[in-house]
Amino acid sequence: MSTQLRTLAVAVALAAAGRGALAQSATPAEFWSALGDTTLVRLVNETRLTNRDIRIALARASAARATRTSAALDLLPVVSTRAGYTRQRIASASLPGVSGAFPDQNVWDAGLALSWEVDVSGRLRQSLRARGAQAEAAAEDVRDVEVSLTSQVASVYLSLRGAQERLAVARRNSENQRRTLEITQRRLEAGRGTQLDTERAKSQLSATLAAIPTLEAAIESGRQRLRVLTGRSRLDELAIPPCETAVELPDAPALGALEQIVRDRPDVRSAERQLDASTAFVGAARAEYLPKLSFGGAAGYTGSEARALGNTGTPRYVIGPVISWPAFDLGHVRANVSAARADEAQSRARYELSVSQAQEELETSIVTYGKSRERLRYLEDAAAASARAAELARLRYTEGGSDFFQVLDAERTLLERENERAVGRTEAETNLIAVYRALGGANVFRSAAR
């Protein structure tokens, strides 16, 4: 009995540890704070608390822990109460040597019943091990859902910010182009310009303004997606104030130091725990080849009247061991063992695949992120040079030192370069989130200026 109680105590402790692990995983990661965007941190925290997918994963983890506790309780004796009433007639023919008719009888019964399977074969312990591994896998699934959803929230948010930046670029360039149009109109009125220059300026301004509705729609779509991910029912509750600073882009981590981190990813750890559970289920299935030893018993009172129950003349009890063995059903046992081994083979393949895919995702995301940071530096230089060139072209045209084609070309190039810079920054930021996702939420970045 003491062995079974110790096993139950271990199961309860594991359940408490699982709840602690979930609570710890729900705290905001330093990674998000290091990015320097308070709105992003707020959205990530709200997602952890209110997202429905996370709530579903938490409910599954709770169910898995309850199943583990139930498996632990199977190791202990089961005591139940019973009370009942029957009316019976006994035929005299069923009692040899007795003649005559027996009158109908009332039988009142109340007492306790005991049943206990002694885990001689280890079947119950293997089942407990399997359920424990499944509970741990469910806890890792919660972490995986959290990492996946918070990464998705961050990617949507950063794409929204990118659309906002491109919208600002379009509006800023449209204002510059509107001033250029006014210059061409004044020159035309003064007899120093041409109608062709004015129409070209109008065409370029209209093309720039045409991009604004599309960007506004992209921003609204991003807000709607964030509303769903954060679990909000109303869009007006989702406040996204203007962001004055860009997200910090840290240096990419070194690949050589990340092999263990890959195996600590929640999806990989979940696959590993599922493999352990499948192995334990094989052991439980094989244990069915061995006999089962159980103890059963009952104690209570029986009488012809309810008020007689409890009197010294009405007690009864029964107790004894029972040994059972499926001697004529071993084919069924063999089939169950084969099925369990097939499940174990699937779980092993899933685990190996998860490790391989995790390594691929991590290596690809780190290389992509590093190259996107490098590309962003060039795009920023190109945008700055284009801004200077556009300003010089407008100045030379105003002073009569160049034709209008140079102004159009410089302004068109400026719009393209600033758009490319905004897109490049969004790509670098979302690639950073992809690295975080590939790391399974681990924060191994070193803060650095771009």
What does each of the following model-derived ranges do?
Residues R55-I56, A72-L73, V118-E146, L196, ...:
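Sec/SRP-type N-terminal targeting helices
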Residues M1-A9:
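Bacterial N-terminal signal peptides that target proteins for export
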Residues G18-G20:
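N-terminal signal peptide c-region/cleavage motif recognized by signal peptidases
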Residues L124, E140-A257, T368, S372, ...:
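Periplasmic alpha-helical coiled-coil/stalk elements that build and connect Gram-negative outer-membrane
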Residues R48, A130, G193, D197-A207, ...:
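Amphipathic alpha-helical coiled-coil scaffold segments and their short linker/junction regions
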Residues R234, L249, E399, E420-R450:
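Acidic, low-complexity, intrinsically disordered peripheral segments
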Residues L22-T67, A246-D276, P326-A327, E352-V355, ...:
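Bacterial Sec-pathway N-terminal export signals of envelope proteins
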Residues A26-L35, R82-A113, D236-A254, G283, ...:
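Small/polar, glycine/serine/threonine/aspartate-rich low-complexity segments that form flexible
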